[in-house]
Amino acid sequence: MAKQIQAIRGMNDILPTQSPLWQKVEAVLRASVAAYGYSEIRTPIVENTDLFKRSIGEVTDIVEKEMYTFEDRNGDSLTLRPEGTASTVRAGNEHGLLYNQEQRLWYMGPMFRHERPQKGRYRQFHQFGVEVYGIGSADIDAEVLMLSARLWEKLGISEHVTLELNTLGDPAERAAYREALIAFLEQHKDKLDEDSQRRMYSNPLRVLDSKDPQVQSILGDAPALMDYLGEESSQHFAQLRELLDAVGIQYRVNPRLVRGLDYYNRTVFEWVTNSLGSQGTVLAGGRYDGLVAQLGGKDTPAVGFAMGLERIVLLLETLELTQDIPAAVDVYVAAMGDSCLVEAIKVAQELRSTLPTLRVMSHCGGGNFKKQIKRADKSGAQVALLIGEEELAEGVVTVKYLRNDNEQQRVARNALSAFLAELTK
């Protein structure tokens, strides 16, 4: 027997038993962004490597360690997209979507990062994101946070996630704070772990996010970013908090919250959970007003967020909130004998036409009564429709209940659609 080829480590199949939960999550996401008037954008999986070097930052972990980068036959450096924001900005600039315009966009699709696989975090993962362009005021920051809160409500996990909020100021304020932070870290360099020492000059704000307990104890005396904010940034952050208070969205200001990508400014946020261990972030985002110009467009304010679907699916499974996921089939149609096969196929086709939301599976491949009922039960259907020679002669269908103890019954062929519509509503 030939050796089986396995999936690449960290890149997982989503099997038929798992896909209904994914479909439920995706449906909630699509319905939620539609309620806010956002439009979908789809971008290629492969982009020029420079796009991510210029946007994410060359000294970030993603660019330094995690990107899937290769040369094509023309010698061009290409990369499997590690995140969605840069591609959305590139597409917006390329097609004139962002020039003196407001855009509310969303995307969903696979991303790729070569990092250590762990539960809920994989090398191929699926990301859902929202991006808004052309609006610089705090009310749009509040809107994307309200939208994200709506997602948790619709998924039934509002009580299991909390919002953390911070501001990074504008680029000048951030630069001034960066110098003060470097000066502070230099005084404690011998107590920093290797990773923090490496980041101290290249990306010092990421040291604030260190998980090392000793580093965290040192940071208790570090300068506070809030002390370096100008009036405009302070007012922006204050207005955002006022709006969130007004609509009842609870949050915690976390002065050490920074984002791992270089392009963020002012508002940054994360939704976190205590239900998934140390890897608690389930959604993150913020404002990135300089990125559009950085990638060749006009200065354009922007804000957005992204979430990994694997994390959301894992959270729902961990919280045991998957019980209401419907089976893939509502009705299973079985022919009791070859002479009834054509009639069974006709019944299934008519039901698909008259009841388009009804999920109808036809038995194929023959087999005796016991085998067909076994397959019907395995399909997850609520009922099996049995058509034998007797039913054919009398113009009826036998309805066998598969999920309860109701006695089977016969239903006239011409009344079947109405019967099933009532049964499955």
UniProtKB/Swiss-Prot annotation:
Protein keywords: Aminoacyl-tRNA synthetase, ATP-binding, Cytoplasm, Ligase, Nucleotide-binding, Protein biosynthesis
Q: What's the domain of life for this entry?
A: Bacteria
Its catalytic activity? tRNA(His) + L-histidine + ATP = L-histidyl-tRNA(His) + AMP + diphosphate + H(+)
Summarize the subunit comment: Homodimer.
Query: Which family, according to UniProt?
Result: Belongs to the class-II aminoacyl-tRNA synthetase family.
HAMAP family listed in its UniProt record: His_tRNA_synth (MF_00127)
What is the protein named? Answer: Histidine--tRNA ligase
The encoding gene is hisS
